[in-house]
């Protein structure tokens, strides 16, 4: 996935916006309730360059989820928002694994992200209280060979774990 887009967004009007928003956006029930399970998902071998956000996985009301794996993910020149895996529904997301993930951010000098209290995303990424990885309402997380870096200075923490049960960390750097 590479940004900016060759052609402008159809909905950008006079702005003729070409930025690429998110590489992966897995969000059942983003626009209206979509009840059911999200399980046994494998997202593998993806590369992202010059995107606003590499990936956002969000469960909403009426969704249950387990066994979500993102592996062999590379992101360069990422611009605006941390990667995130979140549950805002009735139950937490169980068994999330990030393995062999390397994300490099351009950097955000916006001091407003520090201490921000995130709310449920509507239909896309949004500003978060960290620049690299945000996890919310997850039961069990395994981070293996995860690297986060920021090219032009860091504002705020690299990662935020909000209401996360057990976390196993193996070879993680930022």
Regions found by a protein language model. Name each.
Residues 1-174:
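Extracellular/periplasmic carbohydrate-active domains that bind, remodel
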């Amino acid at each position: 996935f590479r940004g900016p887009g060759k052609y402008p967004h159809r909905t950008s009007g006079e702005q003729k916006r070409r930025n690429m928003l998110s590489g992966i956006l897995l969000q059942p029930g983003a626009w209206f309730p979509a009840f059911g399970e999200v399980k046994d998902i494998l997202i593998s071998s993806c590369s992202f360059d010059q995107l606003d956000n590499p990936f956002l996985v969000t469960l909403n009301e009426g969704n249950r989820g387990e066994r979500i794996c993102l592996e062999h993910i590379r992101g360069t020149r990422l611009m605006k928002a941390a990667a995130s895996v979140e549950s805002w529904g009735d139950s937490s997301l169980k068994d999330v694994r990030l393995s062999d993930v390397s994300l490099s951010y351009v950097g955000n000098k916006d001091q407003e992200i520090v201490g921000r209290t995130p709310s449920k995303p509507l239909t896309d990424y949004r500003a978060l209280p960290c620049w690299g990885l945000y996890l919310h309402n997850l039961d069990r997380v395994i981070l293996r060979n995860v690297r986060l870096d920021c090219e032009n200075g860091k504002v705020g923490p690299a990662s935020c774990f909000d209401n996360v049960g057990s976390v196993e960390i193996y070879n993680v750097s930022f």
